[in-house]
Regions:
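Short, acidic/polar
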Residues: 10-18, 157-163
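Active-site catalytic loop in hydrolytic enzyme cores
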Residues: 53-55, 65, 82-171, 175-179
């Protein structure tokens, strides 16, 4: 999905794409990394912190209602404001009945020219998370499958996939902004 600087237009476009995928029979729909805006991590700009939001919050509420309406699981990648000065690159998982199942915070944060993610994001909380925890590697028991969610750069570190698989994930999802 191509994005613009218009957050509301991007959200509406994502909603339309979710509806299209559901109409074609999709059961689990994963949006791209940080879908609500252009990929902003190519520059270090304090104004971009205004893009962050609480999770759960308005986006997860809207996607929960949509998931329930369509009977699909939605994986949404959002810029999370956890506390003042504490931000994460986070995915929220909404089950097919609209229930917010929880979140996963990106563990591996790149910092290379064009990918200044360490300027914006704190790594996720590692540890022996249980299914009810809001931290660490975890699985989400959805209506359709036990899923694991990791984010973009996490794919270059095989222990993330291994841990999540050993925890019982049937399938892994990796929302990414860079392909």
């Amino acid at each position: 999905m191509s994005c613009t600087s218009d957050l509301d237009a991007n959200f509406a476009k994502a909603t339309a794409r979710i509806r299209e995928a559901a109409a074609q029979g999709a059961q689990v729909i994963c949006l791209q990394e940080l879908f609500k805006s252009l990929y902003f991590c190519d520059v270090e700009d304090h104004q971009n912190f205004e893009l962050a939001e609480a999770i759960p919050g308005p986006s997860t509420d809207a996607f929960g209602a949509l998931a329930k309406e369509l009977g699909v699981v939605i994986i949404a990648s959002l810029f999370e404001k956890r506390a003042h000065g504490l931000y994460h690159n986070t995915t929220a998982v909404l089950d097919a009945d609209g229930t917010y199942l929880g979140k996963y915070r990106k563990m591996h944060i790149p910092d290379d020219p064009g990918y200044y993610e360490k300027f914006y994001f704190t790594p996720g909380d590692a540890g022996g998370a249980q299914a009810s925890d809001e931290i660490g590697y975890r699985i989400f028991e959805t209506k359709f499958a036990k899923i694991g969610v990791l984010i973009c750069w996490d794919q270059w570190y095989p222990e993330a996939a291994r841990i999540t698989s050993l925890m019982g994930a049937d399938i892994l999802f990796y929302p990414t902004a860079i392909g």
